[in-house]
C-alpha cells in the first residue's frame, strides 16, 4: 500500500503561522479510555497547545455509565484560553457513551437518555454561541461517528456551519461538486482557509455555503435517496448479473439444441434479452422520481419493467433495439452536460457514502456506455455505409468519458479509445 497520509496536517498548518490549538472532553466509559477526537487538531508531533481531556467528567447516575461531560467546566476553561487559541475542539462524548451502552437499555429508556443528552448539548452550544463574535468566528458541528440504529439508518454524517460568511442554506465543495454533500476530507481545508493558514498536505477543499430555501427538507430528501440507492445497489446488480448469466446459459442451450427461435420458447428468450438490455435504462429512469423507500423503489421497477415489456410486444425487436440504444446515448450525453443530475440517484451511479467518486462516470455506468457507443457506431455504419459518422460518434464518446468536467474516467477513456481504434 503506497498511500501515506500526512498525520497532523491541520495542526502543523495552524502552528506554522503561530496560532494555537486546544481540545476538551472525551468519550471515556467506566471500562475504556476513548480520546480519539484530539487527533483532528494535533500536529505531526502529536502536540496540542491547550485543553483538558482528563478531568472533565462528572458522576451522574442518570447518564450512561453513571458519568457525563462537565459542560460548565469546559465553558469556564474556554473563557480562560479564548484569547490565546484559534482552534478549539470539543468532544461532547455523552452520545458516544449512550451508543456503546444502548444494548443495555430498553427503547423507552434509550430515548429518554438521548433527549436528556441532546438537551445538555443544545444548552452548551447556545452558551458557546453567546460568547462568540459571529464576524470573527466559525462554529462547526459534526458527528463523524457511526449512526445509532434505533434513530435512523442513515450512513451520512451531519455537518452544520455557523459564523462569518456562511449563508443560511446548504453546504458543498469542489471535492464533491454536489449540493448538500461534502467529504470529511474538506473539514481541515475549511478550518485552515478560515484561519488564513496554508492548505498543505490536505486532500480536500474548502467548504462553501449556498443560499437555499427549504434547506432541511432538501437535505432530508437527498439523504433518503442516497440511502436507498446505497442499500439496494449491490443486491440489484447481483440479481441483474445472475439473470444475465442464466439467460446466457439458456441461449447456449437453445443454439446448441438448434431449437426454432420462432416458437414460444424462442420468442420468450428474445423478449428476455431485450428486457435485460433495457434494465440499466429502467434503473436510471426510475431514479428520477423521489424514491425514498425500498417499497417505492420496487414499485417503480415493476412499473417500468411492465412498460418496457409492453413496448417489446408491440414493436419488432430490431426497432426496439435501435430506439433503446439511441435513448441510452441521448440520456448519457444529457446527464454529463447536466452535471449528472439524471443518473445521480441511480444504483448505476457513484455512491457518496463510499466516497470513491462524487461526480463524472462511475465504472458501472462506463461499462454500459461502452456497449452503447459501440452499438451506436455499428448502427450508423449499417445505416450510412460510411465510417465517418460512426468515428465522429466514437470520438465524441471518448471526449464525454475522458473530459475532467464530464465523465472524468481514465479507465473508461482507454477502453472506448481502444474500441474506436479497432473500429477505424
Tell me the role of every PLM-derived stretch:
Residues 111, 115-118, 174-181, 271, ...:
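Hydrophobic alpha-helical scaffolding
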Residues 1-232:
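Soluble extramembrane regions of membrane proteins in the secretory/endomembrane system
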Residues 139, 393-397, 413-424:
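Hydrophobic alpha-helical segments of polytopic membrane proteins
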Residues 220-353, 363-383:
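Core alpha-helical transmembrane segments of integral membrane proteins
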Residues 52, 350-358:
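Amphipathic, glycine/alanine/valine-rich membrane-attaching segments
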Residues 319-322, 384-399:
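Short hydrophobic alpha-helices at membrane interfaces in multi-pass membrane enzymes
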Residues 287-293, 401-411:
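Membrane-interface helix caps and helix-loop-helix hairpins in membrane proteins
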Residues 284, 398-403, 421:
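Alpha-helical transmembrane segments of multipass membrane proteins
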Amino acid at each position: 500500500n503506497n498511500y501515506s497520509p500526512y498525520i497532523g496536517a491541520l495542526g502543523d498548518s495552524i502552528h506554522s503561522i503561530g496560532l494555537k490549538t486546544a481540545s476538551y472532553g472525551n468519550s471515556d466509559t467506566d471500562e475504556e479510555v476513548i480520546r480519539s477526537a484530539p487527533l483532528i487538531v494535533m500536529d505531526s508531533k502529536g502536540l496540542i497547545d491547550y485543553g483538558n481531556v482528563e478531568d472533565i467528567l462528572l458522576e451522574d447516575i442518570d447518564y450512561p455509565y453513571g458519568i457525563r461531560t462537565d459542560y460548565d467546566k469546559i465553558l469556564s476553561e474556554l473563557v480562560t484560553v479564548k484569547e490565546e487559541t484559534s482552534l478549539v475542539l470539543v468532544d461532547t462524548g455523552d452520545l458516544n457513551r449512550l451508543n456503546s451502552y444502548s444494548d443495555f437499555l430498553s427503547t423507552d429508556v434509550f430515548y429518554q437518555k438521548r433527549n436528556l443528552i441532546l438537551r445538555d448539548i443544545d444548552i452548551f452550544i447556545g452558551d458557546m454561541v453567546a460568547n462568540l463574535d459571529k464576524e470573527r468566528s466559525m462554529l462547526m458541528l459534526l458527528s463523524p461517528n457511526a449512526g445509532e440504529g434505533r434513530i435512523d439508518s442513515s450512513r451520512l454524517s451531519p455537518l452544520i456551519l455557523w459564523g462569518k460568511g456562511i449563508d443560511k442554506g446548504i453546504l458543498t465543495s469542489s471535492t464533491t461538486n454536489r449540493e448538500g454533500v461534502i467529504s470529511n476530507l474538506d473539514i481541515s481545508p475549511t478550518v485552515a482557509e478560515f484561519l488564513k493558514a496554508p492548505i498543505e498536505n490536505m486532500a480536500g477543499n474548502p467548504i462553501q455555503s449556498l443560499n437555499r430555501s427549504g434547506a432541511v427538507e432538501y437535505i432530508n430528501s437527498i439523504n433518503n435517496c442516497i440511502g436507498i440507492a446505497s442499500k439496494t445497489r449491490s443486491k440489484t446488480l447481483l440479481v441483474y448479473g445472475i439473470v444475465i448469466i442464466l439467460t446466457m446459459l439458456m441461449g447456449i442451450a437453445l443454439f446448441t439444441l438448434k431449437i426454432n427461435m420462432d416458437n414460444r420458447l424462442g420468442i420468450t428468450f428474445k423478449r428476455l434479452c431485450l428486457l435485460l438490455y433495457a434494465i440499466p435504462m429502467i434503473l436510471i429512469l426510475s431514479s428520477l422520481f423521489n424514491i425514498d423507500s425500498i417499497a417505492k423503489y420496487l414499485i417503480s421497477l415493476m412499473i417500468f419493467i411492465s412498460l418496457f415489456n409492453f413496448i417489446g410486444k408491440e414493436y419488432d425487436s430490431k426497432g426496439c433495439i435501435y430506439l433503446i440504444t439511441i435513448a441510452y446515448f441521448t440520456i448519457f450525453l444529457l446527464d454529463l452536460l447536466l452535471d449528472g443530475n439524471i443518473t445521480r440517484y441511480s444504483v448505476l451511479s457513484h455512491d457518496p457514502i463510499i466516497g470513491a467518486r462524487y461526480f463524472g462516470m462511475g465504472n458501472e455506468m462506463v461499462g454500459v456506455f461502452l456497449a452503447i457507443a459501440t452499438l451506436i457506431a455499428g448502427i450508423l455504419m449499417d445505416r450510412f455505409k460510411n465510417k465517418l459518422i460512426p468515428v465522429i460518434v466514437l470520438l465524441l464518446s471518448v471526449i464525454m468519458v475522458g473530459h475532467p468536467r464530464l465523465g472524468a474516467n481514465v479507465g473508461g477513456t482507454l477502453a472506448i479509445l481502444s474500441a474506436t481504434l479497432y473500429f477505424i
